[in-house]
Amino acid sequence: MKRDRKEEIVQEVAEKINRSQGIYLTEFQGLSVAKMSELRREFRKVGVEYRVVKNTLIKQALKDLAGADKLAPGLKSTTAVAFGFDDPVAPAKVIRKFSKTNDALKFKMASIDGVVFGPDQLPLLSEMLTKTENIGRAAGLINGVVSSVPMVVNAVMRNLVCALDQIAKQKQ
């Protein structure tokens, strides 16, 4: 690969790292082309880009990032990077699900907002709620509160009317 092309790749990877909410490093040695295509399809479904990049080029792209040196141990053997642009935990869910049926895919490490997660923390990451799930829960909570306010107001009004009715009956 020519130097110009390498510099172009470094720039592309650095730009994707800067745009990503989560960066995941995986090892894919032994994964067939068909399985790799299937994995990429699964990543695309959740808005994640998965790309094979040489370790030296990833190191150069990470050079300007704070805390990037913490990812250096993960840059050994074959490396592919999953860029989680919209949701930082979406790649973890795909990696965990796919690696259950494909031993060749191994999670190396991840970085989410500068916090580095090791290979033993994949289950923790994959069980976190996605951005969409969090929004759904928040909307449900808000909806519950909003719908209960009229019921509370109606109950107070009903109790007031009953109390006034009782007072009126006593005065008669």
From Swiss-Prot:
<dbReference type="Pfam" id="PF00466">
    <property type="entry name" value="Ribosomal_L10"/>
</dbReference>
<dbReference type="GO" id="GO:0015934">
    <property type="term" value="C:large ribosomal subunit"/>
</dbReference>
<dbReference type="InterPro" id="IPR002363">
    <property type="entry name" value="Ribosomal_uL10_CS_bac"/>
</dbReference>
<protein>
    <recommendedName>
        <fullName>Large ribosomal subunit protein uL10</fullName>
    </recommendedName>
</protein>
<keyword id="KW-0694">RNA-binding</keyword>
<dbReference type="InterPro" id="IPR022973">
    <property type="entry name" value="Ribosomal_uL10_bac"/>
</dbReference>
<dbReference type="GO" id="GO:0003735">
    <property type="term" value="F:structural constituent of ribosome"/>
</dbReference>
<keyword id="KW-0687">Ribonucleoprotein</keyword>
<dbReference type="InterPro" id="IPR001790">
    <property type="entry name" value="Ribosomal_uL10"/>
</dbReference>
<dbReference type="GO" id="GO:0006412">
    <property type="term" value="P:translation"/>
</dbReference>
<keyword id="KW-0699">rRNA-binding</keyword>
<dbReference type="InterPro" id="IPR047865">
    <property type="entry name" value="Ribosomal_uL10_bac_type"/>
</dbReference>
<comment type="similarity">
    <text>Belongs to the universal ribosomal protein uL10 family.</text>
</comment>
<dbReference type="GO" id="GO:0070180">
    <property type="term" value="F:large ribosomal subunit rRNA binding"/>
</dbReference>
<comment type="subunit">
    <text>Part of the ribosomal stalk of the 50S ribosomal subunit. The N-terminus interacts with L11 and the large rRNA to form the base of the stalk. The C-terminus forms an elongated spine to which L12 dimers bind in a sequential fashion forming a multimeric L10(L12)X complex.</text>
</comment>
<keyword id="KW-0689">Ribosomal protein</keyword>
<dbReference type="InterPro" id="IPR043141">
    <property type="entry name" value="Ribosomal_uL10-like_sf"/>
</dbReference>
<comment type="function">
    <text>Forms part of the ribosomal stalk, playing a central role in the interaction of the ribosome with GTP-bound translation factors.</text>
</comment>
